[in-house]
Amino acid sequence: MSLRVHTHSPSTQGDMAFNLTILSLTELLSLGGLLGNGVALWLLNQNVYRNPFSIYLLDVACADLIFLCCHMVAIIPELLQDQLNFPEFVHISLIMLRFFCYIVGLSLLVAISTEQCLATLFPSGYLCRRPRYLTTCVCAFIWVLCLLLDLLLSGACTQFFGAPSYHLCGMLWLVVAVLLAALCCTMCVTSLLLLLRVERGPERHQPRGFPTLVLLVILLFLFCGLPFGIFWLSKNLSWHTPLYFYHFSFFMASVHSAAKPAIYFFLGSTPGQRFQEPLRLVLQRALGDEAELGAVREASQGGLVDMTV
């Protein structure tokens, strides 16, 4: 089970032109995503008042930034029709780092949706009992656990640490498949509960703020980010996938990572004043610091939004 992506040569000139168009759009979109995530990362790290969800989004922006960097570089040989080829070690390192950031981003989205769901369903109890440094600990745990999984995959499926073990490699990819399914199911359940609470709760006529952002980001993953994970599972579990799905999944992965900053700034901007407000203020508003978060800011002084991590 090699981690290098092999694709069949396009059968016609039209197929080749289509593939090159998709790859070129992927590169351009990734470049725009680098800019957007870089701005979001800088604002979240420097200019935005810290709350637990800003810490989560800071980590998400960091994972997306690294993912897009690896994504852009990894598809250059195919875009140039193999006129430029990276050494095997460099290519494998790029795609494993890209997959690592993909799993980190997915895990962080699950953590965000779960916390927001709990804060919305049980505002008083959850906000009062929430440990002060929970967000920092959860983010650190996700990065470390995903790194260990990535190292195990690298050791079992490549020659980084000796001869690969194909049996162990197959077992690990089955574990990844179960993990991906569990994370997606958890995300769907928490987002559904959050949606029902937002639409049917007593706060449905009030500003939605951060819960809306969470729901939109989850929908973005399900439609744009999930195909990339399905492609990697199908490739490494020897499932047959058509060539067009390969290009489609890579393009949609770029959309997924590049569109998040646009969602942040779109939701945080005031209608009629878009592109006129400071980006810091727009991002602050998207995080819910100027409205309620989890339906109740007044439920707990020093609660989930106002608490500095």
Curated annotation (Swiss-Prot):
Glycosylation positions in this chain: 19, 236
Disulfide-bond pairs as recorded: none
Membrane-spanning parts: 22-42, 60-80, 92-112, 133-153, 169-189, 213-233, 248-268
Keywords, sorted A to Z: Cell membrane, G-protein coupled receptor, Glycoprotein, Membrane, Receptor, Transducer, Transmembrane, Transmembrane helix
Cellular component annotations (GO), alphabetically ordered: plasma membrane
SUPFAM superfamilies: Family A G protein-coupled receptor-like
Biological process per Gene Ontology, one example term: G protein-coupled receptor signaling pathway
Topology within the bilayer: Multi-pass membrane protein
Main location: membrane
Superkingdom in the source lineage: Eukaryota
InterPro entries: GPCR_Rhodpsn (IPR000276), GPCR_Rhodpsn_7TM (IPR017452), MRGPCRE (IPR026230), MRGPCRFAMILY (IPR026234)
GO molecular function annotation: G protein-coupled receptor activity
UniProt keyword Glycoprotein present: yes
Pfam families given in the database record: 7tm_1
Location of the protein in the cell: Cell membrane
Extracellular topology ranges: 1-21, 81-91, 154-168, 234-247
Cytoplasmic side: 43-59, 113-132, 190-212, 269-309
Role: Orphan receptor. May regulate nociceptor function and/or development, including the sensation or modulation of pain.
Similarity comment: Belongs to the G-protein coupled receptor 1 family. Mas subfamily.
Name of the protein described by the UniProt record: Mas-related G-protein coupled receptor member E
Annotated gene: Mrgpre
